[in-house]
C-alpha cells in the first residue's frame, strides 16, 4: 500500500503553525511514503494578504534538506476562492514557483452573502444552511468552468462545518443535478477531484458523490485530510483508500509538475 498525503498545511498558512520540516518527520513516523504541502493562497481581495513565494520555497527547501530521500516531498498550494477575482488569482499564480499540485477550493460565502468563511458561518435554520450550499455551488461552477487548478478540493465541504454545528440533517441530495454537471465539466477539462478524509470525521465528498464521479468517467483522484495540526497528519488515508476501492476506483494519483502519477489501490 502506497501512502500519499496530498493536502497538508504548514506554518506557511495563516491558520497553521508547524514548520514543513517537522511535518515531514511526522509523516515519516506515520508511515507515509509521500506528502505534498498545500498551503493556502488566495486572491488578495479575499483576505488582503500577499503571498511571499520566496519564503514558501525557502521553507520547502529546508524540509527537503532535513528529511533527505527518506520520504518524497512535493510543493503545491490550495488556491482558495478564485471566483472572487479570477484576474487576481491568475496574477497571483503567474508569480508562483514551479508547483507540483494545485487544489482549487471554495472556503467563503460570496460577498453578497457577507463573504464569511464557512468555518465561521452559523445558520439559524435549515433554509439558511441550504442557502449556504446554493451559494457554494454557484461559486464551484464558476471555479470548475475556469479550471486553472489540478484537482477540486473537498467537494461538499459546507457539510463539514454544518455537522459540527448540529445541522446533520442537511445534505447535498437536493442538488444532485448541479453536482453532476460540475463533475462532468471537471472531467471534460481533464481535472481531478480530491477525497478529503476530513481527519477521519466523515469524508468529503462522501461515497455517493465519489461513485457518481467514477460512473461519469472520473479517474483522477487524490487523497488528503486537510490537516493543520501535527497530531492529525496522515489521519484517515488508509480508510480513504478502502473507500475508493468500494466506490469503483482501481488507482489514485499523486502529482509531479502537475502531471499525474498513478498508484494502484
Name these PLM-found stretches.
Residues 1-134, 138, 229-232:
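A metal-dependent hydrolase metal-coordination microenvironment
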Residues 12-14, 106-218:
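Domain-core and long-helix interface of multi-subunit machines
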Residues 39, 106, 156, 225, ...:
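Residues that line or immediately flank small-molecule/substrate-binding pockets and catalytic motifs
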Residues 28, 95, 144-145, 214, ...:
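Non-catalytic positions within long, well-ordered alpha-helices that form the structural scaffold/packing
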Residues 71-73, 150, 251:
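Residue-level recognition of the N-termini of beta-strands and the immediately preceding loop/turn
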Residues 35-37, 102, 152, 193, ...:
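Hydrophobic residues within beta-strands of alpha/beta enzymes
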Residues 32, 99, 148-149, 218, ...:
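A structural motif
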Residues 1-6, 10, 20, 25, ...:
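Charged catalytic cores and adjacent phosphate/nucleic-acid-binding surfaces used
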Amino acid at each position: 500500500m502506497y501512502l500519499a498525503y496530498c493536502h497538508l498545511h504548514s506554518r506557511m498558512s495563516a491558520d497553521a503553525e508547524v514548520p514543513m520540516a517537522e511535518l515531514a518527520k511526522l509523516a515519516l513516523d506515520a508511515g507515509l511514503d509521500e506528502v505534498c504541502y498545500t498551503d493556502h493562497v488566495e486572491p488578495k481581495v479575499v483576505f488582503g494578504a500577499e503571498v511571499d513565494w520566496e519564503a514558501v520555497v525557502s521553507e520547502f527547501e529546508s524540509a527537503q534538506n532535513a528529511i533527505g530521500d527518506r520520504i518524497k516531498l512535493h510543493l503545491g498550494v490550495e488556491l482558495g476562492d478564485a471566483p472572487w477575482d479570477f484576474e487576481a488569482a491568475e496574477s497571483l499564480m503567474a508569480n508562483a514557483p514551479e508547483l507540483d499540485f494545485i487544489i482549487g477550493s471554495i472556503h467563503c460565502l460570496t460577498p453578497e452573502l457577507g463573504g464569511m468563511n464557512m468555518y465561521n458561518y452559523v445558520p439559524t435554520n435549515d433554509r439558511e444552511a441550504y442557502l449556504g450550499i446554493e451559494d457554494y455551488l454557484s461559486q464551484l461552477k464558476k471555479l470548475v468552468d475556469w479550471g486553472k487548478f489540478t484537482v477540486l478540493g473537498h467537494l461538499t465541504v459546507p457539510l463539514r462545518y454544518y455537522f459540527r454545528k448540529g445541522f446533520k440533517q442537511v445534505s447535498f441530495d437536493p442538488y444532485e443535478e448541479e453536482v453532476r454537471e460540475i463533475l462532468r465539466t471537471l472531467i471534460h477539462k481533464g481535472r481531478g477531484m480530491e477525497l478529503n478524509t476530513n481527519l477521519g470525521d466523515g469524508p468529503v465528498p462522501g461515497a455517493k458523490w465519489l461513485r457518481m464521479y467514477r460512473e461519469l468517467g472520473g479517474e483522477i483522484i487524490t487523497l488528503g485530510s486537510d490537516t493543520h495540526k501535527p497530531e492529525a497528519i496522515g489521519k484517515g488515508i488508509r480508510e480513504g483508500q478502502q473507500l475508493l476501492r468500494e466506490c469503483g476506483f482501481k488507482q489514485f494519483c499523486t502529482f509531479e509538475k502537475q502531471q499525474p502519477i498513478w498508484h494502484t489501490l
